[in-house]
């Protein structure tokens, strides 16, 4: 439908216009909905239409103008901010410059502080190294060998000073014999004190060696006692294991007796169930016989009903034939309306009779169907009861089998638990023995490692001491070579400065006697100072002699 400006001149024009619209719907699209009566359409001029449209769209145009103005202002503001962003003669620019200058000053101060911290750390590290070196030097000077070496150094210097004083006194007073004798006595006394001191040190070394031997013997006795205790513990563990096995055998025998008794009771219960099942089966057979008799009677009644129905049908057919014959005779004899009415009445009576017979037949059929449904329901109930009884019997049997299985599983779990406990006890004993052996081996290894580290530390300390002593001896020997014997004696290895072999296994001990090998066994000495056991003075005194 197309509406144009102007007035209509008639229906034919509208029809032609409709035809054109139907032929070309694309060029002139409809401006109004379909099925609109053009007589109800108001036609307005174009100016009026523009005025109405402007009045309707004025708010939208004003809102669009406002949005455009706000957008233009915002864009101008952003451009202004972008332009003045890097200006330095504004408050924001000066503030940013001050912040950057402050940040730069803070970074410089932080860099200076870091440099000072690094220098302080380096200085403290150097101080710590100096303190560590001083402590090491002090600790080195506090060792026994260094003290003995310093004592020898002091003795050497004292002897040198003493000789110098003696020479000075000799050059000053050559005629004083008494002074010389006194000096000689002092020297002899000093040598005597030295010999006594050496003898005392020798006795101390012998006592120390005896103490070491005693400690070694005590360690061996302790090891033997520990080994005996371990053997005793092992025997006790074996005895406990044998007692445990005997007890477990007793428990297993008792469990077997309980299992046999449970099995006997179970078989008795099964026998009773079989008897009950036979009685129930006999009762079920009797009930089945009754049902079969009932079904036979029902079948006989059904057969009789069918025979009666067939007889009834035969009688009806005979009567229908008689009636048809009678009607045919009447039709032949009379063809008037009265005969037709009578025939119609007879047909209606026959139809009514057939209807009653059919209803009776339907009723009998419904009764027979109800009887069959009742019989099927009874049979179904019997079958359902039988199935339910079989299901209950099966469930009861499964419950018994499940209980028996649970019982055997419980017994198996108990046996497994007992075996597991026995294995755990055995494993615990084995682990304990292995732990003892491992601890002993670990202790031995730790002792060996300790001895090795001790020997390495002793070797390092000995090297450091020898270097220090060599430097001191070389510096002292430059002035005089006469009094460096105490220094050489203090430098010699081994306690007491012995001349025997170095015993590595005994902590670097160097005995003061000759030995055959590194074991330290003393060789026989042919020049004995005297008999050790033949004291003739005691023998003569015991015999009564006085000379």
Swiss-Prot record:
<dbReference type="GO" id="GO:0160112">
    <property type="term" value="C:axonemal B tubule inner sheath"/>
</dbReference>
<feature type="coiled-coil region">
    <location>
        <begin position="184"/>
        <end position="254"/>
    </location>
</feature>
<keyword id="KW-0206">Cytoskeleton</keyword>
<protein>
    <recommendedName>
        <fullName>Cilia- and flagella- associated protein 210</fullName>
    </recommendedName>
</protein>
<comment type="subunit">
    <text>Microtubule inner protein component of sperm flagellar doublet microtubules.</text>
</comment>
<keyword id="KW-0963">Cytoplasm</keyword>
<dbReference type="Pfam" id="PF13868">
    <property type="entry name" value="TPH"/>
</dbReference>
<keyword id="KW-0969">Cilium</keyword>
<keyword id="KW-0966">Cell projection</keyword>
<comment type="function">
    <text>Microtubule inner protein (MIP) part of the dynein-decorated doublet microtubules (DMTs) in cilia axoneme, which is required for motile cilia beating.</text>
</comment>
<dbReference type="GO" id="GO:0036126">
    <property type="term" value="C:sperm flagellum"/>
</dbReference>
<keyword id="KW-0282">Flagellum</keyword>
<keyword id="KW-0175">Coiled coil</keyword>
<dbReference type="InterPro" id="IPR043597">
    <property type="entry name" value="TPH_dom"/>
</dbReference>
<dbReference type="GO" id="GO:0005879">
    <property type="term" value="C:axonemal microtubule"/>
</dbReference>
<dbReference type="GO" id="GO:0030317">
    <property type="term" value="P:flagellated sperm motility"/>
</dbReference>
<feature type="region of interest" description="Disordered">
    <location>
        <begin position="210"/>
        <end position="237"/>
    </location>
</feature>
<dbReference type="InterPro" id="IPR039986">
    <property type="entry name" value="CFAP210"/>
</dbReference>
């Amino acid at each position: 439908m197309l509406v144009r400006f102007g007035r209509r001149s008639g229906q034919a024009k509208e029809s032609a216009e409709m035809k054109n619209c139907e032929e070309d719907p694309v060029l002139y699209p409809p401006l109004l909905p379909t099925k609109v009566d053009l007589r109800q359409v108001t036609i307005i001029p174009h100016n009026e239409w523009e005025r109405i449209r402007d009045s309707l769209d004025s708010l939208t145009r004003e809102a669009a103008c406002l949005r455009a103005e706000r957008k233009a202002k915002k864009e101008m503001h952003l451009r202004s901010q972008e332009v003045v962003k890097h200006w330095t003669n504004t408050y924001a620019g000066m503030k940013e410059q001050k912040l950057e200058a402050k940040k730069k000053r803070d970074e410089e101060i932080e860099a200076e502080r870091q440099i000072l911290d690094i220098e302080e750390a380096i200085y403290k590290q150097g101080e710590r190294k100096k303190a560590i070196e001083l402590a090491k030097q002090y600790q080195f000077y506090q060792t026994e060998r260094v003290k003995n070496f310093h004592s020898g150094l002091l003795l050497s210097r004292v002897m040198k000073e003493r000789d110098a004083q003696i020479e000075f006194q000799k050059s000053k007073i050559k005629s004083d014999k008494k002074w010389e004798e006194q000096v000689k006595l002092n020297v002899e006394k000093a040598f005597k004190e030295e010999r006594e001191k050496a003898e005392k040190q020798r006795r101390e070394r012998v006592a120390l060696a005896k103490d070491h031997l005693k400690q070694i013997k005590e360690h061996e006795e302790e090891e033997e006692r520990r080994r005996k205790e371990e053997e005793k513990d092992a025997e006790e563990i074996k005895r406990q294991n044998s007692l445990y096995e005997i007890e477990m055998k007793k428990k297993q025998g008792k469990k077997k007796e309980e299992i046999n008794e449970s099995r006997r009771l179970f078989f008795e219960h099964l026998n009773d169930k079989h008897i009950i099942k036979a009685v129930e089966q006999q009762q079920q057979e009797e009930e089945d016989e009754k049902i079969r008799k009932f079904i036979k009677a029902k079948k006989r009644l059904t057969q009789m009903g069918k025979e009666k129905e067939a007889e009834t049908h035969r009688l009806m057919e005979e009567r229908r034939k008689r009636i048809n014959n009678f009607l045919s005779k009447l039709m032949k004899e009379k063809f008037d309306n009265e005969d037709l009415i009578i025939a119609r009445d007879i047909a209606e009576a026959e139809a009514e009779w057939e209807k009653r017979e059919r209803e009776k037949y339907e009723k009998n059929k419904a009764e027979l169907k109800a009887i069959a449904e009742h019989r099927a329901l009874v049979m179904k109930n019997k079958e359902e009861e039988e199935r339910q009884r079989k299901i209950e019997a099966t469930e009861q049997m499964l419950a018994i089998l499940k209980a028996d299985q649970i019982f055997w599983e419980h017994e198996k779990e108990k046996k497994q638990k007992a075996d597991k406990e026995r294995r755990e006890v055995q494993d615990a004993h084995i682990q304990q023995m292995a732990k003892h052996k491992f601890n002993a081996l670990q202790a031995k290894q730790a002792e060996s490692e300790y001895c090795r580290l001790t020997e390495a530390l002793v070797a390092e300390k000995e090297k450091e001491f020898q270097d220090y002593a060599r430097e001191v001896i070389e510096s002292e020997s430059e002035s005089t070579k006469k009094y460096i014997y105490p220094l050489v004696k203090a430098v010699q290895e081994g306690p007491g400065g012995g001349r025997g072999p170095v015993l590595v296994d005994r902590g670097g001990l160097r005995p003061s006697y000759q030995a055959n090998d590194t074991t330290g066994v003393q060789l026989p000495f042919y020049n004995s100072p005297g008999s050790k056991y033949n004291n003739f003075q005691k023998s003569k005194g015991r015999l009564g002699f006085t000379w």
